Structure formats: structure tokens, C-alpha cells
């Protein structure tokens, strides 16, 4: 089993513990490969997964919300090519929003506007252009990894 398959297996195991009886599948809309947004069958839920540095991370929530999770190495010199001036925390937030939005990197990351939040229990809010906001949280992770979760309730 290659590393990608092993990470997928770990993420599915984590999700199965969170959502007993559910099954998970991914199918790329562009190439048909087993990657891309993970879909849930057998549970009224939505999920998001992310992988970095040998780790697999998973998040689950009610099906009615848009949910995105991203993990990034805390030092990533190549970020400047994708999101000029960004640090790993900024990138994880942007990527979580793009995952929650459902379009991923087909949207220019520069279109995501992130601001510190004032509501209690929320770390940040973000928008893609002038669209409805996503609520965001910075999540503790293992040493060397930053995690961010973005969610948006239905309109």
C-alpha cells in the first residue's frame, strides 16, 4: 500500500469512528480518480480531510453546513508563490475556506479575505469576494503542523 492509500485509509478510519455506519467515497470530477472532496453515504453529515507530514486529519459536521479542514506544515517556503506574504496559519485558513466552498483551488486564493473575529468562540471570519461569510477556528495540532477549520451554515 502506498503512502497516499495509507493516509486515505487512516482518514476513513477516523471518520468511521465519528460516524458509525457511514461510508465515504471520493471521485475527482475532472479525472475520475479517487481523490477530491470526500462524500458521505449512510449519515446526515459532511466531512473534510487533510494530510500533512505523515498525519491524517478529519472533521465532520451536519450535512447542512459547508465544512473545510486544512493542515499545513508550520514552515512552508513555497507559499509565497500561491499566496504572497502568507504564513502557514494564513494559508491553512484560506485553504479551509476554499475546501468548505467546494471549489478548492479553482478559486484564486487571493480572493479569500480573512479577518480576526469578534464573536465569542470564533477565531476568524472569511469571505470569497463579497459572498456570505465563513466562520473559522484555528485548531491545536501536533508540533510542526497548523490546522484550520471553516464552516458556513446554509442561507
Where are these regions (language model features)?
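Core catalytic alpha/beta fold that binds nucleotide/phospho-ligands
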Residues: 1-155
Amino acid at each position: 500500500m502506498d503512502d497516499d492509500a495509507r493516509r486515505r485509509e487512516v482518514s476513513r478510519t477516523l471518520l468511521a469512528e465519528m460516524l458509525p455506519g457511514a461510508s465515504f467515497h471520493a471521485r475527482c470530477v475532472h479525472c475520475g480518480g479517487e481523490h477530491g472532496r470526500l462524500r458521505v453515504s449512510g449519515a446526515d453529515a459532511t466531512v473534510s480531510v487533510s494530510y500533512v507530514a505523515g498525519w491524517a486529519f478529519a472533521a465532520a459536521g451536519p450535512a447542512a453546513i459547508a465544512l473545510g479542514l486544512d493542515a499545513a506544515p508550520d514552515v512552508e517556503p513555497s507559499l509565497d508563490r500561491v499566496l504572497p506574504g502568507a504564513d502557514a496559519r494564513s494559508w491553512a485558513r484560506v485553504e479551509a475556506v476554499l475546501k468548505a466552498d467546494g471549489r478548492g483551488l479553482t478559486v484564486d486564493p487571493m480572493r479569500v479575505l480573512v479577518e480576526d473575529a469578534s464573536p465569542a468562540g470564533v477565531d476568524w471570519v472569511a469571505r470569497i469576494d463579497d459572498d456570505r461569510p465563513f466562520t473559522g477556528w484555528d485548531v491545536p495540532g501536533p508540533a510542526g503542523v497548523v490546522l484550520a477549520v471553516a464552516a458556513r451554515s446554509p442561507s
